């Protein structure tokens, strides 16, 4: 199971989370690396998570069906390190960065939503539109001298 207590989190769930969040970006970047290098302006943009930066606040989840399994944060933290590793390995012809989103509104439980808003200085959860500027920036020449970085787009969640 995914949203279950730590003692019930399975190795299979752990493996699948790492497959999706860490192995897939590794394999995809590896498959594209030569073409990106030939372009001499390649840009890889990974998608991390605030839970790759900070530990979970369990109070957000109390009384809801939501959870925060160990595999999620660990795999997203690993993706941040893979981003840094790839940025030095694929340089100077390919830049590699990571967007780190905060909570995204997906009709979560009302109690979770209300608690989450109190943790965010901007007092709202993100919507997909909130990330387009970060993606455009990292994909463009505006970030020609930016590599190996995590661009946090979390409404201020991680500032407290």
Q: What are these regions, as identified by a protein language model?
A:
Residues 1-13, 37, 45-91, 103-104:
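Catalytic loop of short-chain dehydrogenase/reductase
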Residues 6-9, 17-18, 116:
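A hydrophobic alpha-helix adjacent to the NAD(P)-binding/active-site core of NAD(P)-dependent oxidoreductases
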Residues 29-30, 84:
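A short, exposed helix-loop element centered on a Lys and neighboring polar residues
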Residues 41, 91-95, 146-148:
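Short, small/polar-rich loop/turn modules that mediate ligand/substrate recognition or access, typified
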Residues 46, 95-105, 139, 152-154:
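Conserved SDR Rossmann-fold cofactor-binding beta-strand/turn motif
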Residues 56, 63, 136, 147-160:
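Short C-terminal tail/terminal secondary-structure segment
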Residues 120-131, 142:
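A conserved structural motif in NAD(P)-dependent oxidoreductases
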């Amino acid at each position: 199971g995914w949203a279950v207590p730590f003692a019930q989190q399975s190795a299979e769930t752990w493996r699948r989370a790492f497959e999706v969040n860490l192995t897939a970006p590794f394999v995809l970047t590896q498959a594209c690396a030569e073409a990106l290098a030939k372009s001499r302006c390649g840009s890889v943009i990974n998608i991390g998570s605030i839970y790759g930066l900070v530990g979970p606040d369990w109070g957000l989840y109390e009384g809801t069906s939501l959870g925060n399994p160990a595999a999620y944060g660990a795999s997203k933290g690993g993706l941040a390190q893979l981003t840094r590793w790839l940025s030095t390995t694929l340089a100077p012809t390919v830049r590699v960065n990571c967007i780190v989103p905060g909570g995204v509104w997906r009709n979560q439980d009302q109690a979770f939503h209300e608690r989450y808003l109190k943790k965010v200085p901007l007092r709202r959860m993100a919507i997909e539109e909130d990330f387009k500027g970060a993606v455009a920036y990292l994909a463009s020449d505006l970030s020609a001298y930016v590599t190996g970085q995590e661009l946090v787009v979390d409404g201020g969640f991680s500032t407290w």
